[in-house]
Amino acid sequence: MSLISKKIRNSARGQNCQVRIPSVCNHNSETVILAHVGKGSGMGQKCDDIHATYACSACHDVIDRRVRQGSANEVMVYAYEGMVRTQKLLLEQELIQVAK
């Protein structure tokens, strides 16, 4: 079962890119979407929406390896750092919560 949230996906609209790959990021908030980081549970499956980052179209292309820029490991570091920043924003927007 995947964790899918339309509210989290829609929250990406107008946000700043949180991946910020140097010499790649277009810094255009109009192109930002919720990009999934990592693998799902099977071939062709996406991971949960909580394992995602706000990414501009250029950074998203590199994360998904449609554009080859840097090593896969280097790209994943940027993606995971972006995921952490995105999770902080989702907490601030009260779209996710941590149990007390």
Task: Tell me the role of every PLM-derived stretch.
Residues 1, 76-79:
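Intrinsic-disorder-associated interaction segments
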Residues 27-38, 66-75:
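Short cysteine/histidine-rich zinc-coordinating motifs and their immediately flanking basic loops
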Residues 40, 64, 91:
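Alpha-helical and His/Cys-centered functional microenvironments
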Residues 53-71:
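Short Cys/His-centered divalent metal-binding micro-motifs
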